[in-house]
From Swiss-Prot:
It comes from Coxiella burnetii (strain Dugway 5J108-111). It comes from the Bacteria. NCBIfam families: TruB. It holds the Pfam family TruB_C_2. It catalyses: uridine(55) in tRNA = pseudouridine(55) in tRNA. Responsible for synthesis of pseudouridine from uracil-55 in the psi GC loop of transfer RNAs. GO terms for molecular function: RNA binding; tRNA pseudouridine(55) synthase activity. The gene is truB. Belongs to the pseudouridine synthase TruB family. Type 1 subfamily. One of its GO terms (biological process) is mRNA pseudouridine synthesis. This is tRNA pseudouridine synthase B.
């Protein structure tokens, strides 16, 4: 019997980051709950939803890792996306009703590149009604399913890279490197409108979140097979250390007294510290203890500290 169908499971404190390769046809929360049960984890969270249709990198934070999830929520992300041309849908993907069908113009690489060039850099996006954004506490997608449409504010996002991977008479494949808050379904819908024929997503795969990339992903089916062999005891080796979530911040090594005062919630002075931003905090034994922020008076204030097990 696997953890996913066991009626009662004990829960344990376990800390780390799992880079899950989310299967298609599953919500991000369903994937999260499956992983949480497999690891018998007391606490778990993810760092940004993927559509049910989508596959790929879904970082799952267990235990103390949840304290640092904000640093991945705000990170750049990369995707590969395949769209069908000539058909526009309500949600921008293949899982909602068709809105329009239009003939597809003869497309050349030059014409496609010219169209895509308008979507590189800082662009405006209007989020789809089929999104997790909320209106008066209600997710937009729930309103959309009731046939209700509300006004959405346009937001600015940055498309760092938009590469044409392939195309034919009916479809287009793109690589997208983008800022947080970018809706790939909306991007493809807008590209389809710019081409004059409409388009919608038929396949979407997240390849990268911050410095985490697809080569590090673990499939859910593999975790379940490992669980069946040896329960949760063999799974912890797939967890990455907490510090990997914030490895892009400079590290500061603290004396024992400085670490003590920081862990009591006090801001401290540290020689040769950076002048601004976040820093990784390491104690006198060079163990990661959390994240601090440089204040205007050059002191370091604790922001996220881990609980010692």
């Amino acid at each position: 019997m696997t953890a996913t169908n066991h009626p009662k499971l004990f829960k344990r404190p376990v800390d780390g980051v799992l880079l899950l390769d989310k299967p298609g046809g599953m919500t991000s929360n369903e994937a999260l709950q499956r992983v949480k049960r497999l690891f018998h984890a007391k606490k778990a969270g993810h760092t940004g939803s993927l559509d049910p249709l989508a596959t790929g990198l879904l970082p799952i934070c267990l235990g103390e890792a949840t304290k640092f999830s904000q640093f991945l929520l705000g990170a750049d992300k990369s995707y590969s996306v395949k769209g069908r041309l000539g058909v526009r849908t309500a949600s921008g993907d293949s899982e909602s009703p068709i809105l329009t069908e239009r003939p597809i113009p003869k497309l050349t690489k030059r014409a496609l590149e010219k169209t895509l060039s308008a979507f590189r850099g800082v662009i405006d996006q209007t989020p789809s009604m089929y999104s997790a954004l909320k209106h008066k506490g209600q997710p937009l997608y729930k309103l959309a399913r009731q046939g209700i449409e509300v006004e959405r504010k346009t937001r600015q996002v940055t498309i760092y890279e938009l590469t044409l991977l392939d195309w034919d008479n009916e479809s287009i494949e793109l690589y997208v490197h983008c800022s947080k808050g970018t809706y790939i379904r909306t991007l493809l819908d807008d590209v389809g409108e710019a081409l004059g024929c409409g388009a919608h997503v038929v396949a979407l795969r997240r390849l990268r979140v911050a410095h985490y990339h697809e080569d590090q992903m673990i499939k859910l089916a593999h975790l379940e097979r490992e669980y069946d062999k040896a329960n949760y005891t063999g799974l912890d080796r797939y967890l990455l250390p907490l510090e990997t979530m914030v490895s892009h911040f400079p590290a500061i090594k603290l004396s024992s007294s400085t670490a003590f005062y920081l862990q009591q919630g006090q801001a401290v002075m540290v020689p040769n510290a950076p002048t601004h931003g976040f820093v990784r905090l390491r104690d006198q034994n060079d163990q990661f203890i959390g994240i601090g922020e440089i204040l205007s008076d050059a002191r370091i204030a604790p922001r996220r500290l881990i609980q010692k097990r």
